[in-house]
Amino acid sequence: MAHEVDLESFKELERDIILRVLYRDQTVQSTEEERVRKLKSHLQHLRWKGAKSSSQEYKEKCCARCQRALGLLLNRGAVCQGCSHRVCSECRVFLRRTRAWKCTVCFEDRNVKIKTGEWFFEERARKFPTAGRRETAGAKLLQSYQRLSKISVVPPTPPPFSESQCSSSSRLQELGHFRGFNKSVENLFLSVTTQMRKLSKSQNDMTSEKHLLAMDPRQCVGHTERRSQSDTAVNVTSRKASTPDILKAFHQEDPKHPPDPVLKQDTPPSSPTHSAVFSGGLRHGSLISINSTCTEMGNFDNANVTGEIEFAIHYCVKSCSLEICIKTCKNLAYGEEKKRKCNPYVKTYLLPDRSSQGKRKTRVQKNTLDPTFEETLKYQVDPGQLMTRRLQVSVWHLGTLARRVFLGEVILPLAMWDFKDSTAQNARWYPLRAKAEKYEENIPQNNGELAVRAKLVLPAGPRKPQEAQEGQLALNGQLCLVVLGAKNLPVRSDGTLNSFVKGCLTLPNQQKLRVKSPVLKKQACPQWKHSFVFNGVSSSQLRQSTLELTVWDQAIFGMNDRLLGEARLGSKGGAAGCPDSGSQSKLQWHRVLSSPNLWTDMTLVLH
C-alpha cells in the first residue's frame, strides 16, 4: 500500500536529490508521451490518406491506401492478410522473418503496438479476461457456493432429530444442512460418472492389429480389429461403488458394442521338428490386455464346474519359448443357466506371474458347450525358470456387458514336466476343477531375475596375519556391488513399474548395513547400474555374513511399497520358502570371496 512522502521530514540535501529524481522522471515521461503521440499521429495520417472523399470520383478497382486505379491484367493488386483490403505493389511492406507482406497501415499499426507496449496489455487481457474487473455481489455468491460444494462429501452423522431440543429456527437450519449434503452427493456422483465415461471412451479408441496365418504360411491376411479395454477397468470400479446410479449411467454408455476379450498377434509356424499337434491349425502369440486384473480380484461369477479340456505343451530350446496348444473342450457348464448360453474362451498364466503381461487368451466361441479352438499360445521363458513356474489354464464364459463367469481350471507344475519326452507333447485331456483357495506353498516361486556384479576390494599389500593385531584387518576391506538390472518382474496392469533395489548386509555381530538405489519409473525391465559400497569389512567377516537384495515397486498416494522379489547371498543364503536356492547362493558368494579385486558377474533368481 502506497504512503504519502513528507518532504519536510528530510534534510535539504536529501530533498534536493529526491526532487531531482522526480523532475528527471517527469521529463522522461513527457518525452515518452510525445514519442507515442507522434507514432499514433503518423498511423492516423496513413488512415486518412486512404479514406475516400465524397467530392472525388473513383474507379471500381483502386488501391485502398493510395487510391490509385488497378488494372485488369497488370498491377491488379493483392489482398492484405491483415485488413482484407486490396492494395497496390507500392503500398506493401515485406517482412523478412515471416516472408510475408502487409499493407502500410497494418504494418504501421503493428509497429505502434510493439514500440508503445500495447501488445502486452492486449495479451494480458486475452489470457486473463477477468483481471481488472470489479467483482459483483453475484460473482461473490457463486464463488462461495463453489467453495461449499468442495467440502468433504460425507460429513459426520447428525444427531437424531428431537422436537424438544430444537426450536423452529434450528429446524430450518438443519434442513438447510441436509439439502447442502444431498447437493454435494449429487455433484460427486455426476463427477464420478463423467470420469468413467471419459475413461471408457479413451480406452475404446485403442486398436490392435491381428494377422491370421493358415496352414500355408504364405497365405496371410492382415486386418485391424477394434480393441476395447474398458470392461475390466470399469467392472472393478463399479463393484467398489455401492451407488446404483453410477452403475446405471455407465451401463448406458455403449451397450451395443461389448468389448472383445481376445487380442491376438499371430506368429509364424515353428520348425518342422514339432509334432503334428503344434504344426496344424492357427498359431497365435496372444497379446496381453492392459486391464486384466478384474477376474483375479474376484470380480466374476461361478458356475458348476464340469467338463474337460484338451491341450498340449511344448518347449522350444532354440527360441526359449513355451507353447501351449489349446485344442478343444467338452461338456462345459452353462455360463448363464437361465438363458442356456455359453460363450467360452481359454485364458492361461505362468504362475506366480498374474500380471496382464503374463496373460494369454484365445478367441471366444459363441453358443457352444464343446468349443474347438486349435490355437497356440506362446511364452518367452528361460529354461532356468521353467522349474519354478506353474501353468494355469482356465476356461471362462463371456456374458453380457463383459461379465465373466468361471467355468474351471487346470494347474500343472512345470517342474514335474518332462519336455524331452516326445509323448509328452501329445494333446491330453484334463478334467476341469474349481478355483483353489490357496496354492501349494512348497513350490518355489520365480519373480524374475536380478543381474549384479560383485567384487571384494582388499589392500594392495596386506600385512601378514601374525603382524596384524586382531580386528585391525576388518577395517581394510571393501565390498563393491553393482546392481545392473532386472527382468521378468511381476509388472502392474499397465505393464510398467516404479522399481528400486534395497540392499542389507548383516554382519556376524548382527550389525546391518543398509543401502538403496534410485527409483526408475515406468520401466518393465529396469536397468539401474547403481553401485553399493560396504566399507570396513573383511573376507573373514563376509564368510559369516548375509547379503539380502530386495526389489520393490514404489507405491503412490502414501500406500506401502510392493515387494517384487528377494535374493540372498552368504552363509544363510536362499530365499524363504525356496531351500534349493541356498546351495547356489552359497556357491556364488564363495566365488566372490575367493577371487578378491576381481569382478564376478551373477544372475540372482528373485523369490
Swiss-Prot record:
Biased composition (Basic and acidic residues): 248-259
Highest taxon of the lineage: Eukaryota
Gene3D superfamilies cross-referenced by the UniProt entry: C2 domain, Zinc/RING finger domain, C3HC4 (zinc finger)
Compartment annotation: Endomembrane system
Biased composition (Polar residues): 230-241
Spans annotated as Disordered: 221-279
Stretches assigned to the C2 domain: 305-430, 458-590
Name the UniProt record assigns to this protein: Synaptotagmin-like protein 3
Organism encoding this protein: Mus musculus
The organism's taxonomic lineage, starting at the top: Eukaryota, Metazoa, Chordata, Craniata, Vertebrata
